[in-house]
């Protein structure tokens, strides 16, 4: 439907640098002229923005931006907590599982360790402003992180690895796949079944080449925006 398309286009605009929190949106008449649709269509599009929690209507004043989606820029590697702090958002974590287990073949292969070598397995839900943003299953070699605790997992793993363990993170390999939430994911993420999610696999390595962490994450696609800055490489002229 056209109002949904307009709502998505407005959402992208509201998440840009052109708008800050508490910015006043253009009026219905101006938006109707811009999109060449009726004011009723614009009203329905704004209703969606209200339902998404991005804007509020103030009687006699207008419609205001009250929340932006989480923006993760990919020009450099930053942890989720670092990103959110820069955006002034509050992040908390609920650790559902934290245990030591023998590495199964698939995980051992990712971390470049021996099969059955001891690893930490953790499952946690990351909340932003009290709403679930991400479910993460994480695997880390015990030999590298002897003192990893529940308290560390409730905070930032990047901070723990670099500041407490003194290991510099060199980079990260990631792959993204769109999926639909099954019953278990829907319950843990507090969304309806078949809600679109982003499945992200992540493999972090140190400056010295050791593999530190392998994670499988599910992020709420309606609450998470990725912005890429990619440079084109040109062959050197002889």
Curated annotation (Swiss-Prot):
Residue ranges of DNA binding: 28-47
Gene Ontology terms for molecular function: DNA binding; DNA-binding transcription factor activity
Gene Ontology process terms (BP): negative regulation of DNA-templated transcription
Disulfide bonds: none
HTH gntR-type domain sequence ranges: 1-68
Keywords annotated in UniProt: DNA-binding, Transcription, Transcription regulation
Range of residues in the leader sequence: none
InterPro entries given in the database record: Bact_HTH_transcr_reg (IPR050679), Chorismate_lyase_/UTRA_dom_sf (IPR028978), Tscrpt_reg_HTH_GntR (IPR000524), UTRA (IPR011663), WH-like_DNA-bd_sf (IPR036388), WH_DNA-bd_sf (IPR036390)
PANTHER family in the record: MANNOSYL-D-GLYCERATE TRANSPORT/METABOLISM SYSTEM REPRESSOR MNGR-RELATED, MANNOSYL-D-GLYCERATE TRANSPORT_METABOLISM SYSTEM REPRESSOR MNGR-RELATED
Name assigned to this protein: Uncharacterized HTH-type transcriptional regulator YidP
Organism: Escherichia coli (strain K12)
Gene name linked to the record: yidP
